[in-house]
From Swiss-Prot:
Keywords: Amino-acid biosynthesis, Aromatic amino acid biosynthesis, NADP, Oxidoreductase. One of its GO terms (molecular function) is shikimate 3-dehydrogenase (NADP+) activity. Pathway: Metabolic intermediate biosynthesis; chorismate biosynthesis; chorismate from D-erythrose 4-phosphate and phosphoenolpyruvate: step 4/7. It catalyses: shikimate + NADP(+) = 3-dehydroshikimate + NADPH + H(+). It comes from Helicobacter acinonychis (strain Sheeba). The keyword Magnesium does not apply. Homodimer. This is Shikimate dehydrogenase (NADP(+)).
Amino acid sequence: MGLKSFGVLGNPIKHSKSPLIHNACFLTFQKELGFLGHYHPILLPLESHIKNEFLNLGLSGANVTLPFKERAFQVCDKIKGIALECGAVNTLVLENDELVGYNTDALGFYLSLKQKNYQSALILGSGGSAKALACELKKRGLKVSVLNRSTKGLDFFQNLGCACFTTTPKGAFDLIINATSASLNNELPLDKEVLKGYFKESRLAYDLAYGFLTPFLSLAKELKLPFQDGKGMLIYQASLSFEKFSSSQISYSKAFEIMRSVF
Protein backbone atom coordinates (compact mmCIF):
# COMPACT_ATOMS: atom_id res chain seq x y z
CA MET A 1 0.00 0.00 0.00
CA GLY A 2 1.38 3.38 -1.00
CA LEU A 3 1.84 6.44 1.15
CA LYS A 4 0.58 9.95 0.42
CA SER A 5 1.44 13.11 2.29
CA PHE A 6 -1.01 15.82 3.33
CA GLY A 7 -0.82 18.75 5.71
CA VAL A 8 -2.11 22.03 7.05
CA LEU A 9 -0.17 25.16 6.06
CA GLY A 10 -0.19 28.10 8.43
CA ASN A 11 1.59 30.48 10.79
CA PRO A 12 1.03 29.89 13.69
CA ILE A 13 0.15 26.20 13.41
CA LYS A 14 0.93 24.40 16.68
CA HIS A 15 -2.64 24.93 17.95
CA SER A 16 -4.20 23.07 15.00
CA LYS A 17 -6.23 19.90 15.60
CA SER A 18 -6.40 19.19 11.86
CA PRO A 19 -3.63 16.54 12.00
CA LEU A 20 -5.48 14.66 14.76
CA ILE A 21 -8.80 14.46 12.95
CA HIS A 22 -7.46 13.89 9.42
CA ASN A 23 -5.03 11.16 10.47
CA ALA A 24 -7.91 9.36 12.22
CA CYS A 25 -9.76 9.33 8.90
CA PHE A 26 -6.76 8.23 6.85
CA LEU A 27 -6.23 5.33 9.25
CA THR A 28 -9.90 4.35 9.26
CA PHE A 29 -10.41 4.48 5.50
CA GLN A 30 -7.04 3.27 4.19
CA LYS A 31 -8.53 0.12 2.59
CA GLU A 32 -11.19 2.09 0.73
CA LEU A 33 -8.64 4.68 -0.36
CA GLY A 34 -5.95 2.19 -1.39
CA PHE A 35 -3.26 4.28 0.28
CA LEU A 36 -2.23 5.39 3.74
CA GLY A 37 -2.28 9.14 4.10
CA HIS A 38 -0.25 11.00 6.68
CA TYR A 39 -1.24 14.55 7.57
CA HIS A 40 1.34 16.96 9.05
CA PRO A 41 1.23 20.41 10.65
CA ILE A 42 3.44 22.62 8.47
CA LEU A 43 4.68 25.96 9.77
CA LEU A 44 5.46 28.25 6.84
CA PRO A 45 7.44 31.50 6.93
CA LEU A 46 5.12 34.46 6.34
CA GLU A 47 6.74 35.26 2.97
CA SER A 48 6.21 31.72 1.62
CA HIS A 49 5.05 30.99 -1.93
CA ILE A 50 2.22 28.54 -1.26
CA LYS A 51 2.33 26.60 -4.54
CA ASN A 52 6.10 26.14 -4.41
CA GLU A 53 5.94 24.97 -0.80
CA PHE A 54 3.14 22.52 -1.61
CA LEU A 55 5.01 21.00 -4.54
CA ASN A 56 8.42 20.95 -2.85
CA LEU A 57 6.94 19.09 0.12
CA GLY A 58 5.48 16.45 -2.20
CA LEU A 59 1.95 16.93 -0.89
CA SER A 60 -1.14 15.36 -2.44
CA GLY A 61 -3.46 17.73 -0.60
CA ALA A 62 -3.44 20.36 2.11
CA ASN A 63 -5.55 22.67 4.18
CA VAL A 64 -4.63 26.33 4.40
CA THR A 65 -5.12 28.46 7.48
CA LEU A 66 -4.04 31.88 8.77
CA PRO A 67 -2.66 33.93 7.09
CA PHE A 68 -2.41 32.22 3.70
CA LYS A 69 -5.97 31.65 2.41
CA GLU A 70 -6.09 34.61 0.05
CA ARG A 71 -2.55 33.97 -1.17
CA ALA A 72 -3.43 30.34 -1.90
CA PHE A 73 -6.33 31.54 -4.06
CA GLN A 74 -3.90 33.51 -6.22
CA VAL A 75 -1.53 30.64 -7.04
CA CYS A 76 -3.86 27.75 -7.90
CA ASP A 77 -4.03 26.38 -11.44
CA LYS A 78 -7.79 25.98 -11.04
CA ILE A 79 -10.38 27.23 -8.55
CA LYS A 80 -13.64 25.36 -8.05
CA GLY A 81 -16.92 25.92 -6.21
CA ILE A 82 -17.66 28.80 -3.87
CA ALA A 83 -13.92 29.60 -3.66
CA LEU A 84 -14.41 31.37 -7.01
CA GLU A 85 -16.79 33.80 -5.32
CA CYS A 86 -15.03 34.31 -2.02
CA GLY A 87 -11.46 34.82 -3.23
CA ALA A 88 -10.03 32.53 -0.56
CA VAL A 89 -8.91 28.89 -0.57
CA ASN A 90 -8.61 26.62 2.46
CA THR A 91 -8.24 23.30 0.62
CA LEU A 92 -5.62 22.39 -1.98
CA VAL A 93 -5.66 19.16 -3.97
CA LEU A 94 -3.28 17.91 -6.65
CA GLU A 95 -5.55 16.75 -9.48
CA ASN A 96 -4.00 15.56 -12.76
CA ASP A 97 -0.80 17.47 -11.94
CA GLU A 98 -2.74 20.69 -11.40
CA LEU A 99 -3.11 22.50 -8.09
CA VAL A 100 -6.84 22.89 -7.52
CA GLY A 101 -8.27 25.17 -4.83
CA TYR A 102 -11.53 24.76 -2.93
CA ASN A 103 -13.17 26.51 -0.01
CA THR A 104 -14.86 24.32 2.61
CA ASP A 105 -14.90 27.04 5.29
CA ALA A 106 -18.07 28.58 3.88
CA LEU A 107 -20.32 25.52 4.03
CA GLY A 108 -18.48 24.20 7.09
CA PHE A 109 -19.41 27.31 9.03
CA TYR A 110 -23.06 27.17 8.00
CA LEU A 111 -23.42 23.48 8.83
CA SER A 112 -21.94 24.12 12.27
CA LEU A 113 -24.66 26.60 13.24
CA LYS A 114 -27.03 24.88 15.66
CA GLN A 115 -29.85 27.16 14.52
CA LYS A 116 -30.29 28.46 10.98
CA ASN A 117 -32.99 31.15 11.39
CA TYR A 118 -30.74 34.20 11.71
CA GLN A 119 -31.52 37.36 9.77
CA SER A 120 -28.38 39.46 10.22
CA ALA A 121 -24.69 39.08 11.03
CA LEU A 122 -21.78 41.32 11.97
CA ILE A 123 -18.43 39.84 10.94
CA LEU A 124 -15.34 41.18 12.70
CA GLY A 125 -12.33 40.99 10.38
CA SER A 126 -11.76 40.99 6.63
CA GLY A 127 -9.42 38.06 5.94
CA GLY A 128 -9.94 34.83 4.03
CA SER A 129 -12.25 33.25 6.61
CA ALA A 130 -14.38 36.39 6.79
CA LYS A 131 -14.74 36.36 3.00
CA ALA A 132 -15.92 32.74 2.99
CA LEU A 133 -18.46 33.36 5.76
CA ALA A 134 -19.79 36.51 4.11
CA CYS A 135 -20.32 34.67 0.81
CA GLU A 136 -22.17 31.82 2.49
CA LEU A 137 -24.34 34.02 4.70
CA LYS A 138 -25.27 36.31 1.79
CA LYS A 139 -26.17 33.21 -0.23
CA ARG A 140 -28.46 32.15 2.64
CA GLY A 141 -30.25 35.50 2.58
CA LEU A 142 -28.75 37.18 5.66
CA LYS A 143 -28.01 40.87 5.90
CA VAL A 144 -24.23 40.94 6.44
CA SER A 145 -22.14 43.76 7.90
CA VAL A 146 -18.35 43.73 8.16
CA LEU A 147 -16.28 45.69 10.66
CA ASN A 148 -12.53 46.02 10.18
CA ARG A 149 -10.01 48.39 11.72
CA SER A 150 -8.75 49.48 8.30
CA THR A 151 -10.21 49.71 4.80
CA LYS A 152 -7.90 46.90 3.64
CA GLY A 153 -9.91 44.22 1.88
CA LEU A 154 -13.28 45.93 2.33
CA ASP A 155 -13.79 46.45 -1.42
CA PHE A 156 -14.50 42.72 -1.73
CA PHE A 157 -17.29 42.89 0.84
CA GLN A 158 -18.80 46.04 -0.66
CA ASN A 159 -18.96 44.33 -4.06
CA LEU A 160 -20.66 41.38 -2.36
CA GLY A 161 -23.37 43.71 -1.05
CA CYS A 162 -22.26 43.84 2.58
CA ALA A 163 -22.38 46.99 4.69
CA CYS A 164 -18.76 47.84 5.57
CA PHE A 165 -17.40 49.82 8.50
CA THR A 166 -14.07 50.88 9.99
CA THR A 167 -15.78 52.34 13.07
CA THR A 168 -18.41 50.56 15.12
CA PRO A 169 -21.81 50.65 13.40
CA LYS A 170 -25.03 51.29 15.26
CA GLY A 171 -27.73 48.66 15.31
CA ALA A 172 -28.41 45.11 16.43
CA PHE A 173 -27.17 41.90 14.82
CA ASP A 174 -28.39 38.34 15.38
CA LEU A 175 -24.90 36.90 14.90
CA ILE A 176 -21.64 38.46 16.07
CA ILE A 177 -18.76 36.56 14.47
CA ASN A 178 -15.12 36.97 15.46
CA ALA A 179 -13.11 36.19 12.33
CA THR A 180 -10.02 38.09 13.52
CA SER A 181 -6.86 36.56 15.00
CA ALA A 182 -7.38 38.44 18.30
CA SER A 183 -8.33 35.30 20.22
CA LEU A 184 -5.05 33.60 19.30
CA ASN A 185 -3.36 36.50 21.11
CA ASN A 186 -5.79 36.21 24.04
CA GLU A 187 -7.29 39.59 23.17
CA LEU A 188 -10.74 40.97 22.42
CA PRO A 189 -11.38 41.99 18.79
CA LEU A 190 -13.21 45.13 19.91
CA ASP A 191 -13.37 47.47 22.88
CA LYS A 192 -15.03 45.57 25.73
CA GLU A 193 -17.85 48.08 26.29
CA VAL A 194 -18.64 48.26 22.57
CA LEU A 195 -18.74 44.47 22.36
CA LYS A 196 -20.99 44.32 25.42
CA GLY A 197 -23.43 46.63 23.67
CA TYR A 198 -23.61 44.34 20.65
CA PHE A 199 -23.88 41.20 22.75
CA LYS A 200 -26.83 42.56 24.73
CA GLU A 201 -28.87 42.72 21.51
CA SER A 202 -27.49 39.61 19.82
CA ARG A 203 -28.64 35.99 19.66
CA LEU A 204 -25.27 34.24 19.26
CA ALA A 205 -21.58 35.02 19.69
CA TYR A 206 -19.43 32.88 17.39
CA ASP A 207 -15.63 32.74 17.57
CA LEU A 208 -13.73 30.92 14.82
CA ALA A 209 -10.99 30.07 17.33
CA TYR A 210 -11.43 26.76 19.14
CA GLY A 211 -10.07 24.69 21.99
CA PHE A 212 -10.33 27.25 24.78
CA LEU A 213 -12.68 29.86 26.22
CA THR A 214 -11.52 32.96 24.37
CA PRO A 215 -11.93 36.48 25.83
CA PHE A 216 -14.67 37.01 23.21
CA LEU A 217 -16.61 33.94 24.33
CA SER A 218 -15.89 34.58 28.00
CA LEU A 219 -17.60 37.97 27.69
CA ALA A 220 -20.60 36.36 25.97
CA LYS A 221 -20.81 33.79 28.78
CA GLU A 222 -20.65 36.56 31.39
CA LEU A 223 -23.63 38.24 29.70
CA LYS A 224 -25.50 34.91 29.41
CA LEU A 225 -25.48 35.12 25.61
CA PRO A 226 -25.44 31.78 23.76
CA PHE A 227 -21.98 31.24 22.27
CA GLN A 228 -20.14 28.83 20.03
CA ASP A 229 -16.47 28.30 19.27
CA GLY A 230 -14.98 27.14 15.98
CA LYS A 231 -14.75 23.43 16.82
CA GLY A 232 -17.88 22.50 14.88
CA MET A 233 -16.76 24.53 11.89
CA LEU A 234 -13.33 22.89 12.03
CA ILE A 235 -14.80 19.39 11.91
CA TYR A 236 -17.30 20.20 9.16
CA GLN A 237 -14.78 21.99 6.94
CA ALA A 238 -12.23 19.23 7.57
CA SER A 239 -14.69 16.48 6.65
CA LEU A 240 -15.62 18.36 3.46
CA SER A 241 -11.89 18.70 2.70
CA PHE A 242 -11.33 15.00 3.36
CA GLU A 243 -13.98 14.20 0.77
CA LYS A 244 -11.84 16.16 -1.72
CA PHE A 245 -8.64 14.43 -0.56
CA SER A 246 -10.32 11.05 -1.12
CA SER A 247 -11.47 11.97 -4.66
CA SER A 248 -15.04 11.68 -3.31
CA GLN A 249 -14.58 8.01 -2.35
CA ILE A 250 -15.38 8.91 1.27
CA SER A 251 -18.40 11.14 1.85
CA TYR A 252 -18.02 14.10 4.16
CA SER A 253 -20.69 12.63 6.46
CA LYS A 254 -18.63 9.46 7.01
CA ALA A 255 -15.49 11.51 7.63
CA PHE A 256 -17.41 13.79 9.99
CA GLU A 257 -18.41 10.90 12.25
CA ILE A 258 -14.80 9.71 12.59
CA MET A 259 -13.48 13.21 13.21
CA ARG A 260 -16.16 13.98 15.77
CA SER A 261 -15.32 10.77 17.64
CA VAL A 262 -11.67 11.80 18.19
CA PHE A 263 -12.13 15.51 18.92
